[in-house]
Amino acid sequence: GIYRNNFDAALNTRHGFPVFATVLEANHIAKRDDAYAAFRLTEDDEQEIRALARDDRIGKRIIKSMAPSIYGHQSIKTAIALSLFGGVSKDVGGKHRIRGDINVLLLGDPGTAKSQFLKYVEKTANRAVFATGQGASAVGLTAGVRRDPVTREWTLEGGALVLADKGVCLIDEFDKMNDADRTSIHEAMEQQSISISKAGIVATLQARCAIVAAANPIRGRYNPTVPFSQNVELTEPILSRFDVLCVVKDLVDPVQDEMLARFV
């Protein structure tokens, strides 16, 4: 490569002393370590997968392997397994693309292991990005532009949904987000792309990922006497983009509580 020094007179004037930035112009790049080498399937792995696929109980075995440290919640484990495996995206006539990823929303009472499910997916999925509704903004989830402090040029930076491309994006405390921030992810959840036009930069970023989010109901407890949409502070457009809605209720059941205590 070529080693150069980048000199910016305006930056030097502002700081009051010479400032040089090191720039290395590469002529060739040789990749030494492959981060995904451990995930590549060998012929033995493929034969073992085909053997497992012929098992009539493979579905139950997969669901049972989801978060084994959490007792019960078979419906949630089924939804998470479906989201991790995903579906098949379709390109209709080369003009309209239908996403294959499955978006899941977990809504339930406090202390029902919703966040633990998200943490399990974060550690299990090949590519997973974790974010919280209270600490994430529209720019942090989608994309934004910033000015480089040295070159003073505008650069494009992807958010959590872009970084989770071909993976899973996990959002905890989804109901704590601002309405404007939630509106910004409508395109990413349905079209799986993010369009940005700021500071002279016009681009479309890929966000081909499944979204698994967790939220708390209004007033802390789920009310079964009213519809799902009235139990959570989410608008109808955002709810319609979730394929699976899971409700987790903390019911008083002495038998289940005793079985849970024995499991722990």
Name each model-derived stretch.
Residues 2-71:
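OB-fold and OB-like single-stranded nucleic-acid-recognition modules
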Residues 58-264:
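Conserved ASCE/P-loop NTPase catalytic core
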